[in-house]
């Protein structure tokens, strides 16, 4: 790669640009109408405005791909947030014959739908938390909670969600309906899908993430916690 477009702003865009500079890779930045003086632009070799204000500028797939073509980049790095987990963005880059630095469209679709991702983990014999196999109704969630051990709690999650949105911990079956109603409304507002699934809630555990890097040719490694 000789030139990449960084489809993001702020700290992550600066970090990517610094790494590219160390590797001798030219960078192209983008910015919204109200981000014209943002620090990340000073770290880029070239910068282009996306004619929108605020976060919407960094979510405009059509305009970002157009800039990528115009600037003749080899690849696009989405950073995190914004379009980084959007399968349509990965697909658009592929159609434009520009490498997407991130998971494939297929992988993004699978992991964007949490019950599919969990099903894949089970298929690969990876231990998972006890929970529903897919979206649930109030009746199914109530039955699941009754089958849990005494004094156990349940966590409601958005099928299409992430970042804690559409999530509720329920300690009593009597609170389940209200919690599901609220979680469903929140999930629909955030992810355009009201669907929920449930899992046993594990108390006194930590959320741990592991970064994985693949070369697109079957080789992969991880960076621990």
Regions found by a protein language model. Name each.
Residues 1-225:
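N-terminal beta-alpha lobe that positions the nucleotide/phosphoryl donor
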